[in-house]
Amino acid sequence: MTSPKRPTRPKRKQAMLITHLPRLPPVMRSRAALGLTAAAALGRFQLQVCSDCGAVQYPPRESCRRCLSDRLPWTDQSGTGELIAETTVHLSQDAYFRERAPWRVGMVRLDAGPTLIAHLPAAGAAAPARVRVAAKLDKSGQGVLVAFPSHEVITMTDDRQLREMTCDPKGRKVLVTDGETAVGQALVRLLLAAGAGQVWVGHGKSWKKSPGCVEIAALPRVAMLPLDLTDSKSVKSVAGGIGGQVDILINTAEVHRPHGVAAHSGTSARGGIATHGGTSARRGIDDAWAEMDINYFGLLRLAQEIGPAMKSRAAGAPDGPTGPIAWVNLLSIYALSNFPPHGTFSASKAAALSLSQCLRAEMRPSGVRVINVFPGPIDDEWSEALPPPKLTADALAKAVVGALKDGVEDVYPGDVAQEWLLRWRENPKILERELSA
């Protein structure tokens, strides 16, 4: 078992040394091979299995290698097998691997049948050895295979090769956009426990202190800063101050009101007059607008102001915990299919999901991973009318930090989120009808 190392501050770059450009591993994949990436994005190892003859397929293909059937659904695999050969690449024609040489790779014969090529930990066991193959996302966001020793725990962040496939917060500088919520405060504590080097915590009005903010501010390596995602000037101020230092951004800011369409008396912008049913009433801002202003436009403001700085710094050094690696969006399982009792909140999160997919596409060439978190109902005042099970703030924070360590792209914490995801995959239209019943 590798012993976790203490978080260390990255060395200051010398001005006379070359600045590394963002380099990625080979990106091209066939459409069939993207199935491996889709599973790896969820932290799962899947291979194609023929529905007619049962043969497990590798590499991914359009027709069965044994019976030529085209019915090849992706199926979860245990990944157990035997490392039968290994080698170390000292010189590669690919610029990414040339910078990171030497690089260990090996040949694994799975118990399920196929023989495949996998990355090996730099300090892993030599062949022959029992291993467990897992699917991970590489720096380019594509699925790759890694063979871990069966009876040894490898800390990915402490391994020179596997560090490229994780977004572990150890030694990193993290921005949590909203520290006034229970989720934000739980995240700050877990990030510090995971070894984060610095945590900036956003808060709203200085005169309105929420419970827990004082305790959070007193923690070591924590700095509070004013951040209002509805105010472009506030976001620009934060971007100008720390945007060039953020390694991981976790957007926890959200507005949630349990309303459908008919429950709103208007959709006026801030300070306007909302008219409904022949009556008018002054409103500072209505609930639906507030949800969109934070959940969607707040994310857009962050992406436009801090995103470019993270992309430009993402190259870092090939050998160390430096440079931006991840952007985390706290969404909702309601983003997949609208939940009418929380209809406008669902719509705002669906808009944020679509925007985050655009952000992911723009961040991917720089190697910054965009992670979307889809929790079920959270145990707070805005979901108190919903029956259990609900997700606690600590459980959600643990899922976020776990997603960073595992390097996945999408995570669905909680029983409700897992059940809705399964039903949505089976038939989105049926789920829509079930939720509206």
What are these regions (language model features)?
Residues 217-231:
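Rossmann-fold cofactor-recognition segment
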Residues 372, 380, 384-425:
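C-terminal helical subdomain
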